[in-house]
Amino acid sequence: MTQEKFTKTAWGNRPKSRETPYPIAFKSLKICQNIAEILPMIGATEENRIKNMPAVPPDILPAFEKFGARQRAVLLTLRQMIFDVAQSDPRIGSLEEALRWGEPAYLTSQNKTGSTIRLGVEKTSGLPALFFNCNTSLVEGFRQQFGNALKYSKNRAVLVDTAEGQTNDALRLCIAAALTYHLRKKT
């Protein structure tokens, strides 16, 4: 699929950001004994404060630590995408970062515009995934929109080998669709 197909959809045009948010190797997270050592590595830097990228809250941090290094790196990149998409659309408002089923979850609690997105690893494949409420039509819509450009797990998840390259734009659109799900549902 061409890049244009990823950016012009029913969900609107989205910015094309190719920044790599986490330059640090996350294998070092396990050897850090002190939370104060970990926070600067995952977003509590001046550069990310300028971008409005919040650090991973201390109560959420253990959920990321339970994943393998490669999975954690992909999931943290997806986390940044979620915040980037939310900041690019003023209708979404601020996000609440919480634990759901022991995994990081992102809710539009302020404006209630969207459906919860949860980050985790799909059990069968072992791939990092964006999990969506299975009672929504989100994943079916992604299948229709992106076809084989993305991998799916039933009606609940988009599987992610890597959050870079051409799938980056598709993933951003999936995130935007989830975070604005209730806006479209009302119209």
Task: Label the model's feature ranges.
Residues 29-187:
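Charge-dense, helix-prone N-terminal extensions
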